[in-house]
């Protein structure tokens, strides 16, 4: 009963934590609006600047790889200096400035530099920002915090490309579309400075530090990273799924974006639900959702129109799990003093295995559908025993832990 009353009547610190998460979530909405809007047209824009298909592949692939690997550096730097806000602000400034500057790129090498800088900015700001969010999670539940944040992220990622598509439909001008994205970029940076001034010390929400080892990272973290890496490696990227829909004529070309929108809607809504369920039930909910999400591959690659739509909804469910529960579970495993390094390492490893797995899935697509689907499903299900081990080594569900202080 006492636990229930705590949730029903939030303390002042819990109210502060909720307001902080909502503010970070809203500024993240405008960040995703900006860079996902730009990324939806990067391919054709580079082509208009006479970049070859090979150049486009190298630019985007190298940008993604750099964007994940640099999180190791950013996370370690944040832990060492404890300058979470300055590093976060630097990352956002670099990222938000890079997007509208694409309107001024006169050639594809300059555009490539800006595209890579945008990824560097994201890599710089993510680990310290996630640590600050995790402080709020100590008060209101790690799953709820990351679920709310991801839901707002996803809606930004949905509206940004839609507005860009609307601008292109009206004017057919890539440069105008990039220039228009300066508006959400400025809103993002304004809200970022408001958050910094309003909540200069989010670590105060942590309360009493948890009794977790501070030397190195605990064994349970490495087990969890191994399981998450398997899930990431088995998950197909949407461009390959869209490519298959077009090649197999499963879905009409004009409906493919609708399928993606359905997936994003499930992902954004699911993030909220899954985060709350994780706080209440712990790792058992992650295990159940991992098994369900593994079913997307046979549905999207072998099914007809309606089964493919169901598969995309399940794919979106998986994305919601990836973006809410999976990062939320890292925070209580690691002491606050090591958390930025842990997030940097975790997201770098997760991203690199996603990249390698996507490459293998794409390779198998041209050889054998059966092998490709088996690769995807087996790798995701192989994470379940590791998650079971992690569940045994972690304590009570995260909401209880968050409210115990």
What are these regions (language model features)?
Residues 103-115, 300-311:
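Helix-loop junctions at membrane interfaces in 12-TM secondary transporters
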Residues 282-326:
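C-terminal transmembrane helical hairpin of 12-TM major facilitator-type secondary transporters
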Residues 10-64, 223-252, 256-259:
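Helix-loop boundary and gating motifs at the non-cytosolic
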Residues 338-366:
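A late C-terminal transmembrane helix in Major Facilitator Superfamily
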Residues 114-155, 329:
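Cytoplasmic helix-loop-helix junction between adjacent transmembrane helices
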Residues 176-193, 372-388:
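Symmetry-related core transmembrane helices of the 12-TM Major Facilitator Superfamily/SLC fold
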């Amino acid at each position: 009963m006492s636990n229930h009353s705590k949730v029903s009547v939030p303390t002042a610190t819990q109210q502060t934590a909720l307001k902080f998460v909502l503010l970070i979530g809203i500024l993240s909405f405008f960040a995703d609006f900006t860079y996902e809007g730009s990324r939806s047209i990067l391919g054709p824009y580079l082509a208009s600047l006479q970049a070859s298909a090979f150049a486009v592949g190298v630019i985007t692939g190298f940008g993604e790889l750099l964007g994940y690997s640099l999180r190791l550096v950013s996370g370690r730097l944040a832990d060492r200096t404890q300058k979470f806000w300055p590093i976060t602000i630097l990352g956002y400034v670099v990222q938000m400035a890079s997007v509208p500057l694409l309107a001024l790129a006169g050639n594809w090498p300059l555009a490539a530099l800006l595209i890579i800088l945008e990824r560097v900015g994201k890599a710089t700001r993510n680990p310290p920002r996630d640590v600050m969010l995790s402080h709020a999670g100590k008060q209101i539940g790690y799953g709820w915090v990351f679920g709310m944040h991801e839901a707002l992220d996803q809606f930004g990622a949905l509206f940004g490309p839609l507005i860009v598509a609307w601008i292109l439909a009206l004017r057919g001008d890539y440069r105008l579309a990039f220039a228009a994205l300066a508006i959400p970029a400025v809103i993002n940076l304004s809200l970022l400075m408001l958050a910094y001034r309003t909540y200069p010390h989010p670590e105060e929400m942590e309360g009493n530090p948890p009794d977790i080892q501070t030397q190195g990272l605990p064994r349970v973290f490495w087990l969890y990273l191994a399981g998450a890496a398997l899930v990431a490696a088995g998950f197909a990227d949407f461009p390959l799924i869209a490519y298959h829909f077009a090649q197999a004529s499963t879905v009409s070309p004009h409906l493919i974006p609708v399928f993606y929108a359905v997936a994003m809607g499930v992902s954004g809504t699911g993030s909220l639900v899954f985060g709350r369920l994780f706080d209440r039930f712990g790792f058992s909910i992650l295990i159940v959702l991992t098994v369900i999400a593994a079913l997307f591959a046979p549905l999207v690659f072998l099914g007809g129109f309606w089964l493919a739509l169901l598969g995309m909804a399940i794919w979106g469910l998986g994305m919601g799990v990836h973006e809410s529960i999976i990062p939320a579970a890292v925070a209580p495993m690691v002491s606050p003093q090591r958390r930025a390094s842990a997030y940097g390492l975790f997201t770098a490893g997760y991203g690199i295995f996603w990249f390698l797995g996507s490459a293998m899935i794409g390779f198998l697509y041209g050889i054998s559908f059966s092998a490709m689907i088996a690769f995807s499903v087996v790798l995701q299900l192989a994470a379940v025993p590791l998650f079971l081990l992690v569940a045994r080594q972690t304590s009570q569900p995260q909401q209880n832990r968050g409210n115990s202080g």
